[in-house]
């Protein structure tokens, strides 16, 4: 073959798509936003707390990522990290419950659907529980209930604020009444925590539904939600079939709940850590620090009922009180 023929064949193969070798792109290098379809470099997305830079869609993250986003480096101490569920009911649907547990444990690297522990947020110690939707839809079984209850009890003993990040489809059907009773158990622990005058902040993420919504998700002193999160008890179709009415488009969203007074604030993930620190410091015992307008600024996408444009706070007679406008 002459040199001319070699170059001719080379040019022909480069123009033929079937002859052109495929470029290999490393897995996980780019992430596509499920809301707007934008491809974003994974490291850039992680630096933005897994919030799409184009449409601000909050991409679902694991419990491990949540802990890394909130807790100061090298301060996380897990509680009961190896607590695992058994199968006392010998439940089986398409597969035995015990097999399903093993499947999700291998898939996520977690023993169950929640991580709990003690750590610092900007040097402030907190008791943190983080539900993981990747483990059986974040469903609440006996292990989830037990770990959260122990976390709250430890926080009560050590006078720590409790923060629980909720992401759940509700009670775990494979555990029947053992799952449902966790609602009352966690709620009872939270009542003791409240009587000890300690702070509890639930953070509702997409989705927070079922028995979790009907119990500890809605028992906070201050209830925070991420933007556009689905929050509710029964599903939309079930409600529409029951009431025989068409529901609003934004029904069961965090924005709808804020408008109707069911939650206290919508805070973007990128501003969550800063907001939590301010709330924790504001609720410290004997804290009478003057809260300035600047310290309450949270950003254009953060909806707080106590933002500076709504109230100026001042101290009078050893109490923090709203100052009349004008």
UniProtKB/Swiss-Prot annotation:
Organism encoding this protein: Trichodesmium erythraeum (strain IMS101)
GO terms of biological process kind: fatty acid biosynthetic process; malonyl-CoA biosynthetic process
Pfam families noted in UniProt: Carboxyl_trans, Zn_ribbon_ACC
Location of the protein in the cell: Cytoplasm
UniProt-listed NCBIfam families: accD (TIGR00515)
Upper classification of the organism: Bacteria, Bacillati, Cyanobacteriota, Cyanophyceae, Oscillatoriophycideae
Family recorded in the similarity comment: Belongs to the AccD/PCCB family.
Domain of life (superkingdom): Bacteria
Name used for this protein in its record: Acetyl-coenzyme A carboxylase carboxyl transferase subunit beta
Job of this protein: Component of the acetyl coenzyme A carboxylase (ACC) complex. Biotin carboxylase (BC) catalyzes the carboxylation of biotin on its carrier protein (BCCP) and then the CO(2) group is transferred by the transcarboxylase to acetyl-CoA to form malonyl-CoA.
Domain CoA carboxyltransferase N-terminal: 29-298
Metabolic or biological pathway, per its Swiss-Prot or TrEMBL entry: Lipid metabolism; malonyl-CoA biosynthesis; malonyl-CoA from acetyl-CoA: step 1/1
Entry keywords, A to Z: ATP-binding, Cytoplasm, Fatty acid biosynthesis, Fatty acid metabolism, Lipid biosynthesis, Lipid metabolism, Metal-binding, Nucleotide-binding, Transferase, Zinc, Zinc-finger
């Amino acid at each position: 073959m002459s040199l001319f023929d070699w170059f001719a064949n080379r040019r022909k193969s480069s123009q033929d798509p079937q002859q052109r070798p495929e470029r290999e792109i490393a897995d996980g290098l780019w992430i596509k936003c499920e809301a707007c379809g934008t491809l974003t470099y994974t490291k850039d997305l992680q630096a933005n707390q897994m919030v799409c830079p184009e449409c601000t869609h909050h991409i679902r993250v694991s419990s491990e990522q949540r802990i890394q986003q909130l807790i100061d480096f090298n301060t996380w101490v897990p509680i009961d990290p190896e607590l695992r569920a058994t199968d006392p009911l010998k439940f089986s649907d398409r597969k035995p419950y015990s097999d399903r547990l093993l499947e999700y444990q291998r898939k996520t690297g977690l023993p169950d659907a929640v991580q709990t522990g003690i750590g610092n947020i900007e040097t402030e110690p907190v008791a943190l529980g983080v539900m993981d939707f990747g483990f059986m839809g974040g469903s609440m079984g006996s292990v989830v209930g037990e770990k959260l209850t122990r976390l709250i009890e430890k926080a009560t003993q050590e006078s720590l604020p409790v923060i629980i990040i909720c992401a759940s489809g509700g009670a775990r059907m494979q555990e029947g009444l053992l799952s449902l009773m966790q609602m009352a158990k966690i709620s009872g622990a939270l009542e003791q925590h409240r009587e000890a005058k300690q702070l509890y902040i639930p953070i509702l993420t997409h989705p927070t539904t079922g028995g979790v919504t009907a119990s500890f998700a809605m028992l906070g002193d201050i209830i925070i939600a991420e933007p556009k999160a689905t929050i509710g008890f029964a599903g939309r179709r079930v409600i529409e079939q029951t009431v025989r009415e068409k529901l609003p488009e934004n029904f069961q969203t965090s924005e709808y709940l804020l408008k109707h007074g069911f939650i206290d604030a919508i805070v973007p993930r990128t501003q969550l850590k800063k907001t939590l620190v301010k709330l924790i410091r504001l609720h410290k015992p004997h804290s009478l620090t003057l809260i300035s307008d600047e310290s309450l600024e949270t950003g254009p996408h953060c909806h707080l009922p106590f933002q500076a444009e709504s109230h100026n706070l001042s101290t009078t007679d050893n109490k923090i009180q709203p100052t009349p406008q004008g």
